[in-house]
Amino acid sequence: GTRYHTAVQLDVGLLLSMHLTSQGDITATGLQPAVYEEQVRQRRRGVRLDEDVRLHNGQRVARPAGVQDAASQFVELSHRLATGQLSTEPGTAIPLWLARPGGVDEWTYDVVGEDTLHLPRLGAVRALHFRPRPLAKPRGPIHAEIWFAPSLQYLPVRIRITQGPDTFMDLLADTIEQQ
């Protein structure tokens, strides 16, 4: 099988430093994460995904089919969109299991619709807006809305990370590099 490695890095000066990494296998059904690590500020936490999921505290929980992690979800959703596995109709609900250091939860993203984003270097870009539903048992106030650009192989061009009613980061793609 073929392996993958993906990383998401955010550095907002002294306010926040966040680094997410995911490694695993590329299979016929999509990405299959094996190791996920996140470092927020100086705190490093991780998850191991084998037959089951080993959380940061050592607890083992069942591994749902197709489970992703906080970094691999962006690549997996882009792939599913680009290959026509997901509907882009507004109102479509897209379920996705996510493994994070504190637990495994089923997230549901709603396709909100299509927006035209004005990106600093890329100009006007049409993008599909995905919004997560609140979790039944939230592990914290953080959630991420994602905009995927059909003209850029459905890569995410905007991610809005919200932590509570008044705190958010709005991340816009500056350049798109593919390897």
Regions found by a protein language model. Name each.
Residues R45-S87:
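Hydrophobic, well-structured mid-protein blocks that either form specific transmembrane helices
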